[in-house]
Swiss-Prot record:
Presence of the UniProt keyword Glycosyltransferase in the record: no
InterPro entries reported for this sequence: Formyl_transferase-like_C_sf (IPR011034), MPG (IPR003180), MPG_sf (IPR036995)
Alphabetized GO MF terms: alkylbase DNA N-glycosylase activity; DNA binding
Family the UniProt entry places it in: Belongs to the DNA glycosylase MPG family.
NCBIfam families given in the database record: 3mg, PRK00802.1-2
CDD domains: AAG (cd00540)
UniProt entry tagged with the keyword Hydrolase: yes
Xref: Pfam families: Pur_DNA_glyco
Name this protein carries in UniProt: Putative 3-methyladenine DNA glycosylase
Enzyme Commission number: 3.2.2.-
Keywords for the protein's UniProt record, in alphabetical order: DNA damage, DNA repair, Hydrolase
Organism per entry: Listeria innocua serovar 6a (strain ATCC BAA-680 / CLIP 11262)
Length: 207
């Protein structure tokens, strides 16, 4: 088993650095009698109080965003279009910044169960989007407020991407300058990246 990420991983790193550094890590969900996992290939950083695209812009504190003001490694799930999206809180308590997990490359041993969770979706469609990957992993709103360090969800060091590419975030129009922040990070060439064109897929993704 690869080394699990501990709270020290979040120390002395910015949210942007964390969004880059977890590319290639294995996201694991232990549920019932099986374990499902995949390698993170796409993330987005959300910079809290100063980021118009963040739920916590201007330090907005609501029932939904309350967990964003918690400690690093806390899990923030929310629903959008009947899908659950997965985020990790990144900064010290009181600073509501987070990283959204947008896409995974599933591990081989997880694919069969993931296909059942995704109602027989197969191939890249299995986990090439934030709502798809949570469904494949069996995550839900019940995971809101858990942490990566004392729950059935965790991160492990796993793969090293050949190139990490930074681009604009997806689905954040009309957010002023925040619309153009290059805060989406991908393992360049992965076929599991969301909104990917076939010509962008590469055979050389990991070191």
């Amino acid at each position: 088993m690869n080394a699990k990420i501990t709270p020290t991983f979040f120390e002395n790193r910015t949210t942007i650095e964390l969004a880059r550094d977890i590319i290639g890590m294995r996201l694991v969900h232990e549920i019932g009698n099986y374990t499902l996992s995949g390698y993170i290939v796409e993330t987005e950083a959300y910079l809290g109080a100063t980021d118009m695209a963040a739920h916590s812009f201007k330090n907005l504190r609501t029932k939904r965003t309350e967990v964003m003001f918690g400690t690093p490694g806390t899990i923030y799930t929310y629903q959008m279009h009947q899908q659950v999206l997965l985020n990790f809180i990144t900064m010290r308590e009181g600073i509501p910044e987070a990283v959204l997990i947008r896409a995974l490359e599933p591990t081989k041993e997880s694919i069969e169960q993931m296909e059942q969770n995704r109602f027989l979706k197969t191939g890249f469609e299995l986990t090439n989007g934030p709502g798809k990957l949570t469904q494949a992993l069996g995550l839900s709103m019940q995971d809101y407020g858990k942490t990566l360090f004392d729950s059935n969800i965790w991160l492990e060091r796993a793969k090293v991407p050949h190139i990490i590419e930074a681009t604009n975030r997806i689905g954040v129009p009309n957010k002023g300058i925040a619309t153009h922040y290059p805060l989406r990070f991908t393992a360049k060439g992965s076929p599991y990246i969301s909104a990917q064109r076939k010509r962008q897929i590469s055979a050389y993704i990991w070191e």
